[in-house]
Amino acid sequence: MDVTEKVNLVLRPPTEEVVTQEELLELFKTNSKPKHYIGIEISGFLHLGSLISTSFKINDFVKAGVDCTVFLADWHTLLNEKLGGSFETIRKVSKYYDDAFRLVCPKANIVLGTDLYDSKKEYWSELVQIAKHMSLARTMRTLTIMGRSENDEKVDLAKLIYPAMQATDIHSLDLDIVHAGMDQRKIHMLVKDVFPKMKWKVPVAVHHKLLPGLAKPPEEKPSGEVVKMSKSDPNAGIFIHNSDDEIRTKIKKGFCEEGRTENNPILEIAKHIVFHEFDTITIERPEKFGGNVSYDNFESLESDFLQKKLHPTDLKQSVGESLVKIVSPVREKLVLSNELSDLIKNNLVFDRRH
């Protein structure tokens, strides 16, 4: 595979941004096996965004010859008070995440945060070094990576450690490529600003599109801001453990205004999930409504939807069936005990209240 093909794999949707493409091109020219990571907080049930979309992108990196790592950030999860702030619960749920990513990304390395910190005695001294290059104001601005407001005056001291730890993770893993959803952009920009001053390796940053929730987006949200699929709201997205009928029903109820292409979750799923997995989407409909039609690229489907040649009901039916084909094999192989399921459910109630 030549360098251009590798770059195109990285740029493939759901990728939204590469900082920078020139650096990525040069990296592939000089490094036959660059090191990648994506950090994952261990929180609720895995869904279409947190497992499927993320794994599709990881597998693109693998195809491009990249050495990929899924970093299960157990200590970051504790700092962010997920799963009730119980480290015992976090450790139990981390096994579920480990199993899931090994299943969907079989060629990726899985690293638990605790294991990294136990194996690298210099980690904490490096954490202090990078913290000395971070002002309190900039640290506060990066709190959005945790889903927190940068204006939160009641934030506890522990949460302020989170951004510095994430930056130190990147250095400790000796990474060439850092990968995350767009919500992690601020920490990656901090890394690209601070690491050169410390004479540390500066990685390329790759950010993928966050899948939106299925509900109609709030009108007051600024243009381009995404209400992402939530692990704590059972009605907000497609979860790996939803049955086939639940998947179809959720898609059927999802927001998909006729002719509207902006902030349309069903179109986003078609683009970033369905077309990633399948070369063609076939819309089945009666002859009186135009008969069956197939699309071999998202742009033509989007164009027909915009011109109201493709009705939301028909699009939803096709997307729902496609998702069943994608999710059901994962659901059937990913074991989730009743005990662990109840543990996650109970702690999600706690997370929503705090």
Give the ranges of each region predicted by the language model.
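Short glycine- and acidic-rich boundary segments immediately preceding or forming the N-terminal edge
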Residues: M1-V18
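N-terminal catalytic cores of NTP/NDP-binding nucleotidyl/phosphoryl-transfer enzymes
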Residues: P14-E81, I177-V191
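The substrate-binding groove and active-site-proximal loops of carbohydrate-active enzymes
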Residues: G44, G84-T89
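Divalent metal-coordination and catalytic microenvironments
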Residues: H47, F101, V226
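Short connector loops at secondary-structure junctions
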Residues: L72-G85, H208-L214
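Short acidic, glycine/serine/threonine-rich loops at helix termini
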Residues: E81-L83, K121-S125, P217-P218
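Divalent-metal (Mg2+/Mn2+/Ca2+)-assisted nucleotide/phosphate chemistry catalytic cores
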Residues: F87-H207
